[in-house]
Design a protein with these regions (language model features):
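Active-site-proximal helix/loop segments of hydrolytic enzymes
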Residues: 1-125
């Protein structure tokens, strides 16, 4: 599971980063689950996490498993899983930066953000 703030987060300007944080969370979750084989849960939007509430940049919190789950606990204790988890998270961050290169985040008159694809060279000429 990954966690990001909601679009309506009442703290600071973190809502300004919602679209990017949501996309980062989705990509990290996809890559993490693909690499580790962990059951994919959804991205959770929460507004009670200090780590996301006051951030000035897009954020993601990664829950790699549940210590209350014996299977997860044993799995997270292995070097192999931790290495695969790190690779999956890194792949997700790389995918996010690739997405940023091909997308722009536009702010409309209501202050909401939407992600759009950047124009290609053929669109410009």
């Amino acid at each position: 599971m990954t966690i990001c703030q909601s679009a309506n987060n009442p703290y600071a300007d973190c809502a300004a980063h919602y679209v990017e944080s949501r996309k980062l969370s989705e990509l990290v979750l996809d890559e993490f689950c693909s690499k580790t084989g962990i059951f994919k849960q959804n991205v959770r939007e929460m507004d009670d996490m200090t780590g996301t509430n006051w951030s000035q940049v897009p954020t993601v919190i990664v829950e790699m498993g549940f210590l209350s789950n014996v299977s997860d606990d044993r799995l997270m204790a292995t070097e192999y899983f931790r290495q695969e988890a790190a690779i999956g998270i890194a792949n997700g961050v790389d995918a996010y930066f690739e997405w940023l290169e091909t997308s722009t985040v536009d702010e409309n008159a209501t202050g909401d953000q939407t992600a759009t694809e950047s124009p290609t060279e053929t669109d410009i000429s």
